[in-house]
Protein backbone atom coordinates (compact mmCIF):
# COMPACT_ATOMS: atom_id res chain seq x y z
CA UNK A 1 0.00 0.00 0.00
CA UNK A 2 1.41 3.41 -0.93
CA UNK A 3 1.81 6.20 1.61
CA UNK A 4 -0.91 8.18 -0.15
CA UNK A 5 -3.36 5.26 -0.02
CA UNK A 6 -2.54 4.65 3.65
CA UNK A 7 -3.22 8.30 4.44
CA UNK A 8 -6.60 8.11 2.72
CA UNK A 9 -7.49 4.97 4.67
CA UNK A 10 -6.53 6.60 7.97
CA UNK A 11 -8.55 9.72 7.11
CA UNK A 12 -11.51 7.51 6.34
CA UNK A 13 -11.21 5.66 9.64
CA UNK A 14 -11.06 8.95 11.51
CA UNK A 15 -14.08 10.31 9.65
CA UNK A 16 -16.07 7.20 10.58
CA UNK A 17 -15.72 8.21 14.24
CA UNK A 18 -17.29 11.61 13.57
CA UNK A 19 -20.97 12.32 13.17
CA UNK A 20 -23.10 15.42 12.85
CA UNK A 21 -25.30 15.94 15.88
CA UNK A 22 -28.05 18.53 16.33
CA UNK A 23 -29.06 19.35 19.90
CA UNK A 24 -32.15 21.34 20.80
CA UNK A 25 -32.40 24.10 23.37
CA UNK A 26 -36.07 24.94 23.32
CA UNK A 27 -36.75 26.39 19.87
CA UNK A 28 -33.03 26.75 19.15
CA UNK A 29 -31.30 24.10 17.06
CA UNK A 30 -27.59 23.68 17.73
CA UNK A 31 -25.38 22.15 15.05
CA UNK A 32 -22.28 20.24 16.05
CA UNK A 33 -19.94 17.36 15.33
CA UNK A 34 -19.39 14.48 17.75
CA UNK A 35 -16.16 12.48 17.70
CA UNK A 36 -15.93 9.11 19.46
CA UNK A 37 -12.82 7.29 20.70
CA UNK A 38 -11.69 3.97 19.24
CA UNK A 39 -12.67 1.75 22.14
CA UNK A 40 -15.66 -0.29 23.17
CA UNK A 41 -16.21 1.04 26.68
CA UNK A 42 -19.88 1.38 27.46
CA UNK A 43 -19.51 4.80 29.03
CA UNK A 44 -17.16 7.57 27.97
CA UNK A 45 -16.18 10.89 29.50
CA UNK A 46 -17.16 13.79 27.26
CA UNK A 47 -15.56 17.12 26.42
CA UNK A 48 -17.68 19.98 25.05
CA UNK A 49 -15.73 22.61 23.12
CA UNK A 50 -17.04 26.20 22.90
CA UNK A 51 -15.66 28.45 20.17
CA UNK A 52 -14.90 32.14 20.47
CA UNK A 53 -16.40 35.24 18.88
CA UNK A 54 -17.32 34.60 15.24
CA UNK A 55 -15.72 31.16 15.39
CA UNK A 56 -17.28 27.83 14.49
CA UNK A 57 -17.29 24.14 15.32
CA UNK A 58 -14.27 23.72 13.02
CA UNK A 59 -11.97 25.17 15.68
CA UNK A 60 -12.91 22.40 18.10
CA UNK A 61 -11.72 19.66 15.78
CA UNK A 62 -8.16 20.57 16.78
CA UNK A 63 -8.84 18.80 20.08
CA UNK A 64 -10.36 15.60 18.71
CA UNK A 65 -7.33 13.34 18.42
CA UNK A 66 -5.82 14.27 21.78
CA UNK A 67 -9.10 13.81 23.62
CA UNK A 68 -10.17 10.69 21.73
CA UNK A 69 -6.81 9.12 22.59
CA UNK A 70 -7.66 9.75 26.26
CA UNK A 71 -11.00 7.98 25.81
CA UNK A 72 -13.14 11.12 25.59
CA UNK A 73 -16.05 11.73 23.30
CA UNK A 74 -15.77 15.28 21.97
CA UNK A 75 -18.52 17.62 20.84
CA UNK A 76 -17.76 20.84 19.01
CA UNK A 77 -20.62 23.04 17.86
CA UNK A 78 -21.76 26.36 16.41
CA UNK A 79 -23.33 28.77 18.88
CA UNK A 80 -26.64 30.01 17.45
CA UNK A 81 -26.06 33.64 16.42
CA UNK A 82 -22.43 33.33 17.52
CA UNK A 83 -20.88 33.68 14.09
CA UNK A 84 -21.64 34.73 10.53
CA UNK A 85 -20.55 31.18 9.67
CA UNK A 86 -22.79 29.42 12.20
CA UNK A 87 -24.78 26.51 10.82
CA UNK A 88 -27.07 26.80 13.84
CA UNK A 89 -28.11 30.42 13.14
CA UNK A 90 -25.86 33.03 11.54
CA UNK A 91 -27.85 36.11 12.59
CA UNK A 92 -25.18 37.73 14.76
CA UNK A 93 -27.49 40.65 15.52
CA UNK A 94 -29.00 38.29 18.09
CA UNK A 95 -25.66 37.29 19.64
CA UNK A 96 -25.89 37.01 23.42
CA UNK A 97 -23.44 35.84 26.08
CA UNK A 98 -26.33 34.65 28.24
CA UNK A 99 -27.95 32.95 25.24
CA UNK A 100 -24.70 31.11 24.61
CA UNK A 101 -24.54 30.13 28.26
CA UNK A 102 -28.04 28.64 28.09
CA UNK A 103 -27.10 26.77 24.91
CA UNK A 104 -23.99 25.34 26.54
CA UNK A 105 -25.98 24.28 29.60
CA UNK A 106 -28.48 22.53 27.31
CA UNK A 107 -25.63 20.68 25.61
CA UNK A 108 -24.19 19.56 28.95
CA UNK A 109 -27.56 18.28 30.07
CA UNK A 110 -28.10 16.49 26.78
CA UNK A 111 -24.90 14.52 27.19
CA UNK A 112 -25.57 13.82 30.84
CA UNK A 113 -28.83 12.18 29.74
CA UNK A 114 -27.11 9.80 27.30
CA UNK A 115 -26.56 6.17 28.36
CA UNK A 116 -23.03 6.00 26.90
CA UNK A 117 -21.73 9.04 28.81
CA UNK A 118 -19.84 8.91 32.10
CA UNK A 119 -21.76 11.69 33.82
CA UNK A 120 -19.05 12.10 36.46
CA UNK A 121 -16.66 13.25 33.74
CA UNK A 122 -18.07 16.12 31.70
CA UNK A 123 -15.38 18.64 30.72
CA UNK A 124 -15.85 22.12 29.27
CA UNK A 125 -13.23 23.64 26.98
CA UNK A 126 -13.77 27.26 26.01
CA UNK A 127 -11.80 29.57 23.75
CA UNK A 128 -11.91 33.38 24.11
CA UNK A 129 -15.61 34.40 24.33
CA UNK A 130 -16.36 30.69 24.58
CA UNK A 131 -14.05 30.69 27.60
CA UNK A 132 -16.15 33.37 29.26
CA UNK A 133 -19.30 31.41 28.48
CA UNK A 134 -17.75 28.18 29.77
CA UNK A 135 -16.67 29.85 33.01
CA UNK A 136 -20.17 31.25 33.54
CA UNK A 137 -21.73 27.87 32.75
CA UNK A 138 -19.48 26.01 35.19
CA UNK A 139 -20.38 28.56 37.85
CA UNK A 140 -24.09 28.12 37.17
CA UNK A 141 -24.13 24.29 37.10
CA UNK A 142 -20.99 23.39 39.08
CA UNK A 143 -22.10 19.88 40.01
CA UNK A 144 -22.52 18.98 36.33
CA UNK A 145 -19.00 19.98 35.20
CA UNK A 146 -16.05 17.85 36.30
CA UNK A 147 -13.20 19.96 34.89
CA UNK A 148 -12.87 23.32 33.19
CA UNK A 149 -10.31 24.33 30.55
CA UNK A 150 -10.14 27.97 29.48
CA UNK A 151 -7.98 28.96 26.52
CA UNK A 152 -7.28 32.71 26.42
CA UNK A 153 -10.67 33.33 28.11
CA UNK A 154 -12.25 36.70 27.37
CA UNK A 155 -13.30 37.49 30.92
CA UNK A 156 -12.60 41.10 29.96
CA UNK A 157 -15.58 41.43 27.60
CA UNK A 158 -17.82 43.40 30.00
CA UNK A 159 -15.07 45.82 31.03
CA UNK A 160 -13.95 46.34 27.45
CA UNK A 161 -17.39 47.22 26.15
CA UNK A 162 -18.43 49.20 29.22
CA UNK A 163 -15.43 51.44 28.68
CA UNK A 164 -16.80 52.18 25.21
CA UNK A 165 -20.49 52.35 26.09
CA UNK A 166 -20.48 53.83 29.58
CA UNK A 167 -24.26 54.03 29.91
CA UNK A 168 -27.04 52.11 28.19
CA UNK A 169 -28.05 55.20 26.22
CA UNK A 170 -24.67 55.10 24.46
CA UNK A 171 -25.33 51.68 22.92
CA UNK A 172 -26.34 51.94 19.24
CA UNK A 173 -28.73 49.59 17.49
CA UNK A 174 -25.83 48.03 15.58
CA UNK A 175 -22.14 47.69 16.42
CA UNK A 176 -19.61 46.13 14.06
CA UNK A 177 -16.63 44.25 15.45
CA UNK A 178 -14.23 42.88 12.82
CA UNK A 179 -17.05 43.49 10.32
CA UNK A 180 -19.47 41.31 12.31
CA UNK A 181 -22.77 43.12 13.05
CA UNK A 182 -23.98 42.86 16.65
CA UNK A 183 -27.23 44.08 18.14
CA UNK A 184 -28.09 46.19 21.18
CA UNK A 185 -28.93 43.10 23.24
CA UNK A 186 -25.32 41.88 23.48
CA UNK A 187 -24.03 45.12 24.97
CA UNK A 188 -27.01 45.68 27.26
CA UNK A 189 -26.47 42.23 28.78
CA UNK A 190 -22.72 42.58 29.31
CA UNK A 191 -23.25 46.04 30.79
CA UNK A 192 -24.45 44.33 33.97
CA UNK A 193 -22.25 41.23 33.76
CA UNK A 194 -19.52 40.85 36.40
CA UNK A 195 -17.73 37.55 35.73
CA UNK A 196 -15.39 37.82 38.70
CA UNK A 197 -18.36 38.01 41.07
CA UNK A 198 -19.53 34.53 40.08
CA UNK A 199 -16.89 32.34 38.42
CA UNK A 200 -15.48 31.04 41.71
CA UNK A 201 -18.78 29.29 42.44
CA UNK A 202 -17.19 26.50 40.43
CA UNK A 203 -14.98 24.49 42.81
CA UNK A 204 -13.57 21.87 40.45
CA UNK A 205 -10.14 21.76 38.76
CA UNK A 206 -9.42 24.55 36.27
CA UNK A 207 -6.69 24.92 33.65
CA UNK A 208 -6.14 28.28 31.95
CA UNK A 209 -3.85 28.51 28.93
CA UNK A 210 -2.80 31.82 27.41
CA UNK A 211 -0.05 33.29 25.26
CA UNK A 212 2.22 35.97 26.66
CA UNK A 213 1.76 38.03 23.46
CA UNK A 214 -2.04 38.10 23.68
CA UNK A 215 -3.17 41.62 22.78
CA UNK A 216 -6.89 40.91 23.11
CA UNK A 217 -7.17 39.38 26.57
CA UNK A 218 -5.17 40.66 29.52
CA UNK A 219 -2.97 38.15 31.32
CA UNK A 220 -3.93 39.97 34.52
CA UNK A 221 -7.50 38.69 34.15
CA UNK A 222 -6.29 35.11 33.81
CA UNK A 223 -4.05 35.49 36.86
CA UNK A 224 -6.96 36.97 38.80
CA UNK A 225 -9.16 34.04 37.83
CA UNK A 226 -6.53 31.50 38.90
CA UNK A 227 -6.26 33.23 42.27
CA UNK A 228 -10.04 33.04 42.73
CA UNK A 229 -10.61 29.43 41.78
CA UNK A 230 -10.12 26.83 44.49
CA UNK A 231 -8.00 24.53 42.31
CA UNK A 232 -6.50 26.18 39.24
CA UNK A 233 -3.28 26.76 37.38
CA UNK A 234 -2.20 29.01 34.53
CA UNK A 235 0.06 27.81 31.73
CA UNK A 236 1.66 30.59 29.68
CA UNK A 237 2.79 29.84 26.13
CA UNK A 238 5.72 32.02 25.18
CA UNK A 239 5.30 33.97 21.97
CA UNK A 240 1.65 33.01 21.47
CA UNK A 241 -1.00 35.61 20.80
CA UNK A 242 -4.78 35.38 20.97
CA UNK A 243 -5.11 31.88 19.56
CA UNK A 244 -2.58 29.12 19.09
CA UNK A 245 -0.88 27.84 15.95
CA UNK A 246 1.43 24.97 15.13
CA UNK A 247 3.80 24.27 18.01
CA UNK A 248 1.75 26.56 20.27
CA UNK A 249 -1.34 24.42 19.71
CA UNK A 250 0.67 21.27 20.39
CA UNK A 251 1.95 22.74 23.65
CA UNK A 252 -1.61 23.57 24.67
CA UNK A 253 -2.75 20.04 23.82
CA UNK A 254 0.06 18.57 25.92
CA UNK A 255 -1.08 20.66 28.88
CA UNK A 256 -4.66 19.52 28.35
CA UNK A 257 -3.57 15.89 28.12
CA UNK A 258 -1.68 16.13 31.41
CA UNK A 259 -4.60 17.92 33.06
CA UNK A 260 -7.10 15.24 32.05
CA UNK A 261 -4.99 12.15 32.76
Language-model regions, residue ranges each:
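N-terminal cap/lid segment of alpha/beta-hydrolase-fold proteins
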Residues: 15-40
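The serine-hydrolase catalytic nucleophile loop
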Residues: 53-65, 220
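Alpha/beta-hydrolase active-site loop
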Residues: 59, 94-115
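Conserved alpha/beta-hydrolase
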Residues: 67-87
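Hydrolase active-site cap/lid region
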Residues: 136-184
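Short beta-strand/loop motif that positions the catalytic acidic residue
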Residues: 202, 208-210, 214
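Conserved alpha/beta-hydrolase "acid-adjacent" motif
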Residues: 215-221
Amino acid sequence: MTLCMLSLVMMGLHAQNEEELWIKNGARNIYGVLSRPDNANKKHPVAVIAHGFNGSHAFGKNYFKTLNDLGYMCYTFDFPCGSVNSRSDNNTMNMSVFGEQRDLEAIVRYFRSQPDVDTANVVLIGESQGGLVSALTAADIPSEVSRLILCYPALCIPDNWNSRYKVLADIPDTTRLWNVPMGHRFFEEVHYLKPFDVIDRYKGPVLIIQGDKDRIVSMDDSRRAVAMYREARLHVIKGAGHGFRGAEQQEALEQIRDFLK
